[in-house]
Amino acid sequence: MRIENIGFIGLGAMGSVMAPLLGKSGYNVLGYDIGSKIEKSTGVSQVQSLNDLKNMDVIIFMLPNSKIVAQVINELLDINTKSILIDMSSSDPRETKQLGKTLQDKGINFLDAPVSGGVSRAKTGNLMIMAGGKLEHIKIVKNLLSVMGKVQFAGPLGSGHAIKALNNYVSAAGLIASFEALATARSFGIEPENFLKIINGATGKNNTTEVKLDKFVVSEKFNSGFALDLMVKDVSIANSLVKDLTTKNPLSKSVSHYLSKTLEELGGNPDHTEVYKVLLKN
């Protein structure tokens, strides 16, 4: 199957930088978003109706949650049953599997391929893409997805969304631990520069200590581009997945609860690195 025409639904923080990569790589990309706009100079032609996407080879979704993805797909089914559908959002894997069964009955190929790496890596096409679904279908779209990052096969449909949520839970746990450690180290007179050199040269290093602390926290910029409410959503999904497996989920439960309460305390739409502010205040 030759893939030329791509529909990209969701042109927010991530979609607005992912879709242009496809356009600049030679694909005919039509973008759709009810709230965001994108310039044609990016290589993406924005359309005003889902009807304009009826002849696409592939339709990609980069939307806030599973329910919105399902709503949009239900609207698309009235006009298009030929495209390969790829949900690159951070969706609930259980809802992805359920939606997949419905689409399979209609003969529609559906894949989940969420991403990790944030806006900075999205801009350079260096995302980690976690692909779930039938391997033969993933092979069809692998070259397309590879424009946006490294494609790693996760397993059957829903596995991509599962590992995305679990990855963000592990990342969030490391973030909270790193923030606590930095604040405590400072109380002992340890300068942030020395803290980072020691931790990153020892066994405690993680993505937060290697990437986020100096750039977004110590600098007090708090502008990583990943909103706290999205982290709360992902960790909540992960916590519920762990809970489905075992009632012994003390850490995922604690991380999920702490982040939810912190989001309430901060108010507005804070960056996830602003969790450090609340930790210091308390």
Predicted regions and their residues:
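Rossmann-fold dinucleotide-binding core
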Residues: 63, 90-169
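Rossmann-fold NAD(P) dinucleotide-binding segment
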Residues: 50-108
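Beta-strand segments within the central parallel beta-sheet cores of soluble alpha/beta enzyme folds
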Residues: 193-201, 253-257
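Hydrophobic beta-strand scaffold residues
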Residues: 29, 46, 109-111, 152, ...
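Interdomain hinge/lid region at the active-site interface
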Residues: 157, 211-272
